[in-house]
């Protein structure tokens, strides 16, 4: 249960009970009332700004109104004390019995504690990675892959019906270049000396194997075909090979998509999907024939000094109108974006999230304009931009390229430090802030390494369970037994740990609402820190040890507390896509 939502309802009920009315009549607007943990834990357990946001409407001084509300809240049987602070904040301190009761709820819910119905089954499409199928994934793709994957997991946990999607850019000019590059490697595999890879082609050694496979399958047959026919075969085989490589890289990072959508699908049957999308926009008055003025600065690739078929995107929030067709009659890449969005919308998605690299910042307004025009403003589109990742080793910068045509790949990073450190650390900054990734720091066993610190807390929980088996003979811990004596948890440090656990449902919902999965990584670190501190208190003070052999009821209660910590760590790490270890190796 989200205790903050619970007290939000209690506070609003209290406002009704004291018959609080606007001075000008009508109903009070309660939408701006906030209920959250105080910034300073010493101020209490629950804080609300109710008096400050309502004072003007009711015509009363904020502190006087706060005192009036506070007095009424004291009647709540779960409230120990209520104080008014500052300009009119109301701080509530709750009774230990309330926290003990909530801990029992958490224990009974297990790893489902924190799961929310916020999304109410609403369909959401999260598109992420969508790297061009021209080679292995480099480390720059890594952050978007993790952010998108964890956000999708988070939204699922918050009650949304989520589809994870990858858009395969397999219809552009870069694919023609890729096919020619592989054709060269095919000839090389047949024994031809190809010399230096010509400028403009892909020089990477990863294409050598594709050329060899083609030589093994076709022998010299491709050389005997018309070039266009041969290149079409090479293109298909190469895209399949590149996507197999990309899927393997993503699998190593524990990133999995539900849908791989080929751009070429939009171009079948004379690009029927694109034509239909443009026709729909035309019927809505969003398409016209016109001439764009030359933009200031560097000219974009799709600008031409002629009359063009244009999307009237400035009327739906964009900076300039966008060309839909080129001078040769083919469609612009943007026209494909329109058709792809329409395809998603037609599949029943009213909410779409695009996770893109920071270099795609110029796409945000045009994509938002497409969403408004295609859906008549009914669909919600969000673009999350991921800033660059800089690699370091012991504080020294690491070059991103290894040699000509080669670069540090996602697989290089995962193979060196492991999947879990990569996933966790890619979340340890908000996606729109640059991130430094130090190979040495993410593998050190210290508090300064967040992923180690969190996973170590999980392992410590299980070490407590093993101690319970050794010292108390409790091999199979029973949740009913563990939850039957929570009234014995009275030490302030234990109640403080319960408070931290109680924040989890609110954290899940707020991270989902704001689409900020990094909040989960920060919370897990804070929870781990609280648990490690409690462990250390037991080391310093025998009365606070989790297991008291001479007091089995207290031991069971504390084991129940440890079980909930373990459950929340497991839940959060599962959403992040990392393991919750039972022991550290």
Swiss-Prot record:
Q: Where are the transmembrane segments?
A: none
Q: Which UniProt keywords apply?
A: Aminoacyl-tRNA synthetase, ATP-binding, Cytoplasm, Ligase, Nucleotide-binding, Protein biosynthesis
> Any idea where this protein resides?
Cytoplasm
Motif placement: 'HIGH' region = 131-141
Under the GO molecular function aspect, what terms does this record hold? arginine-tRNA ligase activity; ATP binding
Recorded hits in InterPro entries, A to Z, give: aa-tRNA-synth_I_CS (IPR001412), Arg-tRNA-ligase (IPR001278), Arg-tRNA-synth_N (IPR005148), Arg-tRNA-synth_N_sf (IPR036695), ArgRS_core (IPR035684), DALR_anticod-bd (IPR008909), Rossmann-like_a/b/a_fold (IPR014729), tRNAsynth_Ia_anticodon-bd (IPR009080)
EC top class named in words: ligase
Keyword Transferase annotated: no
Question: Which Pfam family is one of those matched by this entry?
Answer: Arg_tRNA_synt_N
Enzyme Commission code: 6.1.1.19
Out of the domains of life, which is the source?
Bacteria
SUPFAM superfamilies hit by this protein:
Anticodon-binding domain of a subclass of class I aminoacyl-tRNA synthetases, Arginyl-tRNA synthetase (ArgRS), N-terminal 'additional' domain, Nucleotidylyl transferase
Instruction: Show the PANTHER family listed in the entry.
Output: ARGININE--TRNA LIGASE, CYTOPLASMIC, ARGINYL-TRNA SYNTHETASE
Q: Which family does the UniProt entry place this protein in? A: Belongs to the class-I aminoacyl-tRNA synthetase family.
Could you describe the subunit structure of this protein? Answer: Monomer.
Q: What name does UniProt use for this protein?
A: Arginine--tRNA ligase
């Amino acid at each position: 249960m989200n205790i903050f939502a619970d007290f939000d309802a209690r506070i609003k009920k209290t406002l009704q009970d004291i018959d609080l009315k606007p001075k000008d009549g009508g109903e009070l607007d309660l939408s701006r009332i906030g209920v959250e943990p105080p910034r300073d834990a010493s101020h209490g357990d629950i804080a609300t700004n109710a008096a400050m946001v309502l004072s003007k409407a009711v015509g009363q001084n904020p502190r006087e109104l706060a005192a009036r509300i506070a007095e009424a809240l004291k009647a709540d049987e779960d409230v120990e004390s209520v104080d008014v602070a500052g300009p009119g904040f109301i701080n509530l301190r709750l009774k230990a019995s309330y926290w003990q009761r909530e801990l029992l709820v958490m224990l009974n819910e297990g790893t489902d504690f924190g799961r929310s119905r916020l999304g109410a089954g609403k369909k959401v499409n999260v598109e992420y990675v969508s790297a061009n199928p021209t080679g292995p994934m480099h480390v720059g793709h890594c952050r978007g892959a993790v952010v998108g994957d964890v956000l999708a997991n988070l939204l699922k946990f918050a009650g949304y019906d989520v589809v994870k999607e990858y858009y395969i850019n397999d219809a552009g000019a870069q694919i023609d270049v890729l096919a020619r590059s592989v054709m060269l490697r095919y000839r090389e595999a047949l024994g031809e000396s190809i010399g230096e890879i010509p400028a403009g082609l892909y020089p990477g050694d990863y294409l050598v194997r594709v050329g060899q496979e083609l030589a093994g399958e076709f022998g010299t047959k491709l050389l005997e075909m018309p070039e266009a026919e041969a290149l079409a075969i090479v293109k298909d085989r190469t895209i399949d090979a590149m996507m197999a490589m990309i899927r393997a890289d993503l699998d190593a990072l524990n990133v999995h998509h539900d849908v791989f959508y080929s751009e070429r699908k939009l171009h079948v049957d004379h690009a029927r999907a694109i034509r239909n999308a443009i026709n729909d926009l035309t019927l809505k008055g969003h398409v016209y024939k016109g001439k764009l003025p030359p933009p200031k600065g560097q000219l974009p690739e799709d600008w031409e000094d002629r009359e063009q078929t244009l999307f009237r995107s400035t009327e739906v929030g964009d900076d300039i109108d966008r060309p839909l067709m080129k001078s040769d009659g083919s469609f612009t890449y943007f026209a494909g974006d329109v058709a792809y969005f329409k395809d998603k919308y037609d599949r029943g998605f009213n909410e779409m999230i695009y996770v893109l690299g920071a270099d795609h910042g110029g796409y945000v307004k045009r994509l938002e304009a497409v969403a408004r025009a295609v859906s008549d403003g009914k669909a919600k589109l969000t673009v999350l931009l991921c800033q660059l990742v800089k690699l370091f080793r012991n504080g020294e910068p690491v070059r991103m390229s290894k040699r000509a045509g080669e670069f540090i790949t996602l697989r290089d990073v995962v193979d060196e430090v492991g999947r879990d450190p990569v996933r966790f650390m890619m979340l340890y900054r908000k996606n729109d802030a640059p991130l430094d990734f130090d190979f040495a720091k993410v593998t050190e066993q210290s508090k300064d390494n967040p992923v180690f610190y969190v996973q170590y807390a999980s392992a410590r929980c299980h070490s407590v369970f093993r101690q319970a088996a050794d010292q108390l003979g409790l091999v199979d811990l029973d949740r009913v037994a563990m939850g039957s004596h929570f009234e014995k948890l009275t030490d302030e440090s234990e109640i403080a740990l319960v408070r931290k656990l109680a924040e989890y449902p609110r954290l899940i919902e707020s991270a989902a609402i704001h689409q900020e999965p990094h909040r989960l990584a920060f919370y897990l670190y804070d929870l781990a820190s609280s648990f490690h501190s409690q462990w250390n208190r037991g080391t310093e003070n025998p009365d606070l040890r989790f297991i008291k052999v001479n007091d089995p009821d207290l031991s069971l209660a504390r084991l129940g507390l440890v079980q909930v910590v373990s459950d929340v760590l497991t839940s959060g790490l599962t959403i992040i896509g990392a393991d919750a270890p039972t022991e550290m190796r």
